[in-house]
Amino acid sequence: EVDCILDIGGQDMKCIKIKNQTVDSVQLNEACSSGCGSFIETFAKSLNFSVQDFAKEALFAKNPIDLGTRCTVFMNSKVKQAQKEGASVADISAGLAYSVIKNALYKVIKLSDAKDLGQNIVVQGGTFYNDAVLRSFEKIAGVQCIRPDIAGIMGAFGAALIARERHEEGYQTSMLSIDEINALTFDTKLARCQGC
């Protein structure tokens, strides 16, 4: 019995609420990828950390910095200020993990209370491979959630299941063969956009 599926990927977020084993609502972030996985990856690289090591640092944070739910441009300046004030990498990483979740819950999904998600929550998307993001979600939402081993490829897995279900014997695909793909050619040219 699942109440909600929260998917945070590298560029987008999705919240799928389930009622009576049926999709009740789907919410997506709009244009901005603020607070998605690419956001954390960028910060990790700027501090010369791999994403994995940066995430591990967060698990040992003593005082995670509060970045709120603002745009990454504003968060960038808050992180820089925290660095000037002597914040540790662990506290910065933990602060970013919390901000990803706060952004998802309070800006994208627009919750007033995280408990509105329900008790049975599945998290997916590559960002949830980050244990600090997972733990931040559990602490903010007040639940223990389920993170599948294949959290980062759940969308592809679902698409494969649908393709298998809809497959018809004898159906000929319209996709190009690998030889046809390798034989493709293209031309390039430089053009200036006249729309700006």
Language model features with spans:
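Active-site nucleophile and cofactor-binding loops and adjacent substrate-binding regions
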Residues: L6-G10, Q27-G35, G95-Y98, V122-T127, ...
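Conserved phosphate-binding catalytic cores of ATP/NTP-utilizing and phosphoryl-transfer enzymes
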Residues: E1-L6, K14-Q21, S25, S112, ...
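Acidic-glycine-rich active-site phosphate/pyrophosphate-binding loop
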Residues: G9-K19, R70-S77, T127-G142
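Acidic, glycine/GT-rich loop-and beta-edge segments that sit at the periphery of enzyme/chaperone cores
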Residues: K14, E165-C196
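Phosphate/pyrophosphate-binding loops at sites that engage ATP/ADP/AMP, CoA/4′-phosphopantetheine
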Residues: V2, A104-G118
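Glycine-rich phosphate-binding loops at beta-strand->alpha-helix junctions
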Residues: S99, S112-I140, A151-G152
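Adenine-nucleotide phosphate-binding core of ATP-dependent small-molecule kinases
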Residues: S77-Y106
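Glycine-rich phosphate-binding loop plus the immediately following alpha-helix
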Residues: N20-N63, G152-G155, L161-E165
